[in-house]
A protein has these predicted regions:
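Gly/Pro-rich, tryptophan- and cysteine-flecked surface segments typical
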Residues: 4-6, 12-13, 19-171
Length: 171
């Protein structure tokens, strides 16, 4: 019995002596490659308004991914292309059919294109992917948003062609 206590005590002390694991690294300038918006909701008449800002002097491409709160399954994703210092704004609102949708009047380029609104989808939790949760659109009414940096300029030749990246430029 004494031997077991010594081994357990040694194991606990060894575990305490190990430094903490650093799974997340924050750069000194506070900028990163992943942004998590911890909660969106359209429950009880609420809307969630958010903005994505390119703070750099270069064009930037990001993936925007919406996940429902029940099991974190994806309900919508798209790519967003921002010109230097561009701001993209949108909101998540009730879609009038028991679900939710993203609405924007912003002219920044998205793929697929979002001209005004795009509804959240239930393909990740219906059909062959059904789980123990609800399968109707009520499930997409709250969740969280992942914003992932795919690429930031400059181009290899250090150019910045606005015709490719600046959807807000009328010229």
């Amino acid at each position: 019995m004494t031997m077991k206590k010594k081994i357990l005590s040694t194991a606990v002390l060894a575990a305490m002596g190990i430094g903490s694991a650093h799974a997340v690294y924050q750069s000194p300038d506070g900028l990163g490659e992943v942004l998590l918006v911890p909660y969106y909701t359209v429950q009880d008449g609420n809307e969630t308004i958010f903005a994505i800002v390119n703070t750099t002097d270069y064009p930037q491409a990001v993936t925007v991914r919406f996940r429902q709160a029940y099991t974190s399954r994806q309900v919508l994703d798209f790519n967003l292309y921002l010109s230097p210092h561009d701001v993209w704004t949108a909101k998540v609102q009730d879609d009038g059919n028991g679900g939710a949708e993203v609405v924007t009047g912003d002219k920044s380029c998205t793929a697929p294109a979002i001209t005004t609104a795009i509804p959240f989808r239930n393909f990740e939790f219906t059909g062959s992917k059904v789980d123990n949760g609800p399968t109707d659109q009520s499930r997409v009414r709250e969740g969280y948003i992942e914003i992932l940096d795919m690429a930031t300029g400059p181009f290899q030749d250090d150019s910045n062609p606005p015709a490719v990246w600046d959807a807000n430029d009328d010229g």
